[in-house]
A protein has these predicted regions:
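Outer-membrane beta-barrel signature, preferentially recognizing the C-terminal barrel domain
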Residues: 434, 517-572, 590-602, 724-725
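Short, acidic, small-residue-rich periplasmic hinge/interaction motif at the N-terminus
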Residues: 18, 29-33, 65-71, 81-124, ...
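Outer-membrane beta-barrel translocator/receptor signature
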Residues: 192-199, 207-256, 280-283
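N-terminal periplasmic accessory domains that precede
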Residues: 85-90, 100, 104-106, 131-134, ...
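Face-selective signature of the C-terminal outer-membrane beta-barrel domain
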Residues: 282-309, 327-473, 482-488, 492-510, ...
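Short, acidic Ser/Thr/Gly-rich low-complexity loop/linker segments typical of extracellular
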Residues: 36-51
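Short acidic/polar hinge/loop motifs at secondary-structure boundaries
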Residues: 163-188, 285
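Extracytoplasmic beta-strand/coil segments of soluble accessory domains associated
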Residues: 132-164, 202
Length: 762
């Protein structure tokens, strides 16, 4: 059951709230009011299966009231003389609410721990939109291009219920399959340290077989860029549940063009580079199985695989020399995991949770370099194995207080075997092994003080052992041990003076301080050389160490329209990608990550969400950021402005258009300067055949500019301007279907994510 009100004595009233079709209605508010004196019992919220329970009720006559956005209000008079099970309570759909653009706040709520829950099922704003487009209208979520984050913070994680997935996998899930989404603004230590936020997607609980067929295509002036079909399935019967996410590629291509001007010793050189990457087909599949041997136990087994073949061709010339780089790669990713969850009692929410996961990667890449008429070859390869184990204990101490504790162990082993070029010296031979071991322990305590103040404190210990072994030159070996204790505290105060305020009365403020570390991207620590063109390459740095951050933020939600967010961050030993002139190659530059100095950043965000007219809903945000960075011999201080607005115009019940505009002023960092930019996207969408068929046609880059990046060095300056076509047309089509009996209790369905590697370049 979702929630229990009052003391655990007296008469109990239970029931299950459904719609006309028998589907469970979750997060409906249930109230009971005595007819003789008007006394109201504390409201409860229905769970994922639509059930509710109200206890400690005395005998008498009551009015049962149920409300939920998108449905007509339900009222019924009851006589209570003993335990009462109402069975299915049916709510009718509200035609008025579903025919107009509804304020997203009506479909969202804020929990005492700061988590924002957005109901997707039945939400009019979800009709015809992709999940990524729908998220543009969610409070607390920032969508920039195809990247999703919580309040624009780094290190945002995406979960499909209890298992982390990639943003690529998230985009394959159609909103029609989703029950609700939790935006966790204050993730506890079980998600890791230094996590900016968590977006947690919960699937619907109806349909013996619930599925979606999808197709995503994109074309531009460069031809067909993308043709991606997908199939998502969720099936349950008895104690067994199976989910499967399957995505493939018929065609995948990206084109990138740039012009670069280098000025050194008053001599200017211009280089043009064109790069075309083709995915010669890929297949990604994630399968998850859940078995419930008893009402108290959940066992999950899951696995995934991603196989692809890629080809990249890069041409670069400076008027004198012509360089062609061809790459053929075959990456393979695979993963598996086991989870076990045990509830201590049938009516308890206390539990023990164990998670063990394994992931591996096999990668091989053949490289061909042709400089003018001379050819040379290289080959790169690595094998990576990664294991994580983390048990968690969640204890409900009383109605107001919780205690969580957990342990973390992780081990990674990465073996590289690179054969370098023999004539040009572009790639060195590499025989090295990198390994790492993580140890952690954490505990957090949360409590509610009075009715309106929630406080949570966390203490986290983490240690990391990093080992790098160069099999060719032992002078490059690195042994590193880093550890620390990292505290955090969070508080949320409900200023509306109602325990469950309506969206129109919401008034929350929360505070958070945390001291955390941030490890560099793993690929940054590898000495692998990657050439981006004739006169630029990148190389990793095995000597990198962790960053340290102190972060404090204040979040204010006023009524349904306004959200104000302020964040202060101080970080030292920061990892920055720095560009250098190659002393051995004229007019050649390389980027390398380095622990370089410190940063103080202030960020103020003001977001406004409202229904301007019955047909127009807008979500607009303005961010002002002041950042000061400093390293020996150089410092940068700058204030920048970012603006974005997403607008949904409802033309008819199942048709509409959206317009998205974003812009930023010039930004400066220790690494580079980047000109201001702007971009406008438009799309038309429709939902047909009782929302089973959704079609979305997007025109990306209606108008935009091409900003310039500038890097300054000792006696040299480099400018780069991208010339790629940003205008494209995308088509997204999804067909939703369901077969069989209803699925109940759709908790904790896992899926598979995969680790990502970043190249240390701009």
């Amino acid at each position: 059951f979702a929630c229990t009100a009052n003391a655990q004595t007296g008469i109990t009233v239970t029931g299950r709230v459904t719609d006309d079709a028998g589907n469970a209605i979750e997060r409906a508010t249930v109230t009971m009011t005595r007819l003789d004196d008007g006394t109201k019992l504390a409201p409860v919220i229905t769970g994922n299966d639509g059930t509710f329970m109200i206890d400690s009720i005395s005998e008498g006559r009551y009015t049962l009231g149920i409300t939920c956005v998108g449905y007509d209000k339900y009222n019924k008079k009851l006589r209570v003389s003993g335990p009462l099970d109402l069975g299915a309570v049916v709510m009718g759909g509200s035609a008025k609410m579903l025919d107009e653009v509804t304020v997203m706040a009506d479909y969202s709520s804020v929990k005492s721990n700061g988590t924002i829950t957005v109901r997707v099922k039945g939400n009019p704003l979800a009709k015809g939109l992709t999940l990524l487009d729908f998220m543009k209208f969610m409070r607390g979520v920032s969508v920039r291009g195809e990247d999703v984050s919580v309040y624009g913070r780094q290190n945002t994680l995406i979960y499909l219920e209890e298992q982390e997935i990639t943003q690529e996998q998230m985009k394959t899930i159609d909103p029609s399959m989703i029950s609700h989404i939790d935006v966790i603004t204050n993730p506890d230590a079980s998600y890791g340290l230094g996590i900016g936020g968590v977006i947690k997607i919960y699937l619907r609980d109806d349909g013996g077989v619930l599925g979606t067929l999808t197709f995503n295509g994109r074309v531009s002036q460069d031809g067909l860029l993308r043709a991606l079909p997908g199939l998502n399935l969720l099936y349950a019967r008895g104690k067994v549940r199976v989910s499967n996410l399957l995505t493939g590629s018929l065609h995948d291509k990206s084109v990138r063009s740039q012009v670069q001007n280098d000025v050194a010793d008053n001599v200017e050189t211009q280089t043009e580079t064109n790069s075309v990457t083709r995915g010669n087909g890929y297949l990604m599949d994630n399968l998850a199985l859940r078995y419930s041997p008893t009402d108290l136990d959940r066992i999950y087994v899951y696995g995934g695989v991603r196989m692809s073949n890629g080809e990249t061709s890069t041409n670069s010339h400076d008027g004198t020399d012509f360089l062609n780089i061809n790459s053929l790669s075959k990456p393979r990713y695979y993963s598996a995991g086991l989870q076990y969850k045990h509830f201590f009692r049938k009516d308890s929410v206390s539990y023990f949770f164990f998670r063990g996961s394994y992931s591996g990667q096999d990668y091989s890449e053949g490289l061909s370099y042709v400089l003018n008429s001379t050819a040379d070859n290289a080959r790169l390869g690595y094998n990576t194995n990664d294991v994580w184990i983390d048990p968690v204990l969640h204890m409900v101490l009383n109605k107001k207080s919780n205690l969580n504790a957990g342990l973390v162990y992780g081990y990674m082993y990465d073996k590289h075997d690179d054969t370098g070029t023999t004539q040009f010296g572009y790639i060195r031979d590499g025989r090295y092994v990198s390994s790492g071991t993580d140890y952690g322990a954490w505990v957090d305590y949360s409590t509610k003080i009075g009715k309106f103040l929630y406080v949570q404190g966390t203490l986290n210990y983490h240690g990391t052992k990093s080992v790098f072994r160069d099999r060719i030159d032992s002078k490059n070996n690195v042994d590193l041990w880093e550890d620390g204790i990292y505290p955090s505290i969070f508080a949320q105060w409900n200023l509306s003076k109602e325990e469950n305020p309506s969206p129109a009365k919401e008034f929350y403020i929360n505070f958070n301080y945390q001291y955390y570390y941030s490890l560099p991207n793993y690929n940054y620590t590898l000495p692998t050389v990657t050439w981006q063109g004739q006169n630029q390459y990148s190389i990793g740095n095995p000597d990198l160490t962790k960053e340290n951050h102190h972060d404090f933020y204040v979040w204010l939600a006023y009524h349904r329209k306004w959200t104000v967010y302020y964040d202060f961050n101080y970080g030292d030993n920061l990892v920055k990608v720095i560009m250098h002139a190659d002393p051995d190659r004229k007019d050649t530059y390389f980027t390398r990550p380095e622990n370089a100095g410190w940063q103080i950043q202030h960020k103020l965000s003001v977001a406004y969400q409202t229904k301007v007219f019955d047909f127009w809903y807008t979500n607009t945000e303005m961010i002002v950021r002041n950042r000061r960075e400093s390293m020996p011999g150089k410092s940068v201080s700058q204030t920048s402005l970012y603006f974005s607005t997403s607008n949904n115009f409802k033309i008819a019940k199942n048709y509409g258009i959206t317009l998205d505009f974003a812009a930023s002023t010039k930004t400066k960092t220790l690494s580079y300067e980047y000109d201001g930019w702007f971009n406008l996207n438009a799309q038309a969408y429709m939902s047909l055949l009782k929302n089973k068929l959704n079609v979305n046609l997007s025109y990306n880059g209606v108008f935009y500019n091409r900003p310039k990046m500038t890097v300054y060095g000792d006696g040299w300056m480099l400018t780069r301007k991208y010339l790629s076509h940003n205008t494209s047309v995308s088509l997204n089509v999804s067909w939703n279907f369901s077969i069989g009996k209803k699925i109940k209790d759709n908790r904790d369905m896992p899926s598979i994510g995969s680790a990502g590697r970043a190249i240390p370049t701009f």
